[in-house]
Amino acid sequence: MRLHDGIDRNLLHHERKGDGTMFNFFKKKEKAYYDVIAAPLKGETVPSSEVNDPTFAEEMLGKGLAIKPVEGKVYAPFDGEVAMVFDTKHAISLVSAKGTEVIIHVGLDTVMLKGEHYTAHVESGATVKKGDLMLEFDMEAIKEAGYEVITPVIVCNSDDYKDVIRTTGVQVEPGDTVIELDK
């Protein structure tokens, strides 16, 4: 897995485990980030700039990334609260236990589907734990209706953070870290 600066995260993780010698205290310690956002879907992460919608590509709503899903399920990316499930069920906004505001927007212009092909498993105000199933969608039906299923994952209050580190260009499973935030 590659970080934003091209460093192989798996290599770093392996090196940080230590080699059992007494010199482990010289090794760089893993950074503790203020908040972490896990992948809410299974698929490939891509930079926001690759999203075919200027609202997301130009990060008008905040910094983030997008996921090209391979499965029609959306999971909670952290412990927190569902701020809103859009009436059309194509998007969910959440607030983490640490105050990070995230919107997960399934597909582009999918508001036009008026909720068709989406099933919400949570309601506004619900408390969620990382990994809870929040939403299901019929990827093939959405594509057949003429819509892209690429899913932006946006930190709406990204200006509150000094660093927003995104992991793109990799295949992810729900629960894999994709965004790290530092104050």
Predicted regions and their residues:
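Contiguous, well-folded functional domains in the mature portion of proteins
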Residues: 3, 18-183
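Intrinsic-disorder-associated, low-complexity terminal segments enriched in Asp/Asn/His/Tyr and depleted
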Residues: 8-13
